[in-house]
Amino acid sequence: MDKNYGRVTIPTDADMVEETKQTAQRWGADAIRDCDGTQMPDALKSMPVKIYSTYYTTRKDNAWAQANPDEVQQVYLMTEFYTAMEEQAPLRIPLMKHLYQEQLKPNTIHDIKRWWEVIDRTTGEVVPAAEWDYEEESGEVVLHKPGAFHEYTVSFLAFIMWDPVHMYNFITNSWENVEHQITFDVRQPKTQRHVIEKLKQWLKDNPDTDVVRFTTFFHQFTLVFDEFAREKFVDWFGYSASVSPYILEQFEREVGYPFRPEYIIDQGYHNNTNRVPSREFRDFQKFQQREVAKLMKVLVDICHENGREAMMFLGDHWIGTEPFGEYFKEVGVDAVVGSVGNGATLRLISDIPGVKYTEGRFLPYFFPDVFYEGGDPVKEAKINWVTARRAILRKPVDRIGYGGYLKLALQFPDFIQYIEDICNEFRLLYENVGGQQPYSHFTVGVLNSWGKLRSWGTHMVAHAIPYKQTYSYAGVLESLSGMPFDVKFISFDEVLENPAVLDDCKVIVNVGDAYTAPSGGSYWKNPALSCPIKAFVAKGGGLI
């Protein structure tokens, strides 16, 4: 094989036929793809390359979503804290204050007294359903007899009327005259049947597609916008938008206890990755992972039966897929592609077990927030490449690629040249690694509440975007991603069950703010954890 050919995927568009051919030749690309907002040209389908087709299971079908409003995806939200002043009755709590009205709509189709919850945050007690009502016209919950100077919140279900990823792309690209895409819930019966049949027909209608690039499967990570269409709350690992009465009733039957909104809301922390997970939230995660894997397998099997590969994008509607969890390996996904923002996010992809190959979508994405007059996409590409390159030398992805509008990138010739250099350098590095295990001084164990499930992602909030409160801790994992050590992610529960899980480590790293999931919080009160760690150190092991 030509050393300057292969292992690279590039984006295309309907009006970029010759430009795609020229770029593919320069970069040595052996695969082309469409993206959100672009279209695969028929003229390129006969090229001697793999054709990736982006496939959306949860959106781009507004006719279905509008005809089945009860099966639109939902998210659990919590209002701000509202204080009842002395002798104030009733207390009125607006649900949608500081939320983007076009994105979300309170779910009043299902029983609100069953699926919503009003909590006295001063005492921690649930307000009986008989003591509050909802006024749909004003959008307010009304508490009839609040306690003086007590604080209250309302936890409620809302329909996702504008897919948050589509909304982000819409805003970033200043799209006009583009219909807002509604997110529908593939887990629910009618929609599930519709999506399965739609995929079968789509495969018949698109015989030139080699790889179905699922973007992604069923549940969006938590991404909520404020009244100014800015990101208000984001948790790349968040399960808050993987809920519906249908799913929650299934969950109740499995676990044998009634569901409470608070199991998701978690005092407003939304069970983000820094929270030590409760038993109920772990139960919910495990249930979701198993059910998501079962339905994923149905769609993946359909692809295989039609002679296509199934690739999963690690992002967007990826919640519940959990590539480092116990069910993912049973699905049969051929490949995983994900965005590479740094070394840790590269390892988040390249370390995934049980797939035929992995692919890193490098940055910058070809969007106008970077590719504008006066912009410097070469600088962003250099930072991205140099940051991730250390991790490639430890555990490379099998392929790299880019996404977005090729026409924007072509306006920057220096950028096109630099990416050509990156592609050639990547192929050289990959060939030199040659599938071998690089030298390692010893194994470092990263100890936290999550273990393998959050491999390389312990301190991530919005993927690779730095977050002030976790930036330094994330730097520890970023360093480890390219250092000459094997890295093993261990949970506190694993140590409690079998302390011998530490035996192949020479150093244990436990980093994070006090009382958080990365550091452990109350886990350390248990001598069944602290004593084995002390014994590990006494025998010569290191503890950071």
What does each model-found stretch correspond to?
Residues 2-56, 66-96, 100:
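Noncatalytic N-terminal accessory/assembly modules of large enzymes
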Residues 8-50, 197-215, 328, 335-338, ...:
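Catalytic domains of carbohydrate-active enzymes, especially glycoside hydrolases
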Residues 71-330, 348, 434:
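Polysaccharide-binding and catalytic clefts of secreted carbohydrate-active enzymes
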Residues 465-544:
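Helical hinge/lid and interdomain linker segments adjacent to catalytic or ligand-binding clefts
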Residues 8-17, 32-38, 54-58, 216-217, ...:
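Structural motif
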Residues 5-14, 29-35, 84-85, 174-193, ...:
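The substrate-binding groove and active-site-proximal loops of carbohydrate-active enzymes
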Residues 44, 63-65, 199-200, 213-217, ...:
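Hydrophobic targeting/anchoring helices
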Residues 31, 51, 310, 358, ...:
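Hydrophobic beta-strand scaffold residues
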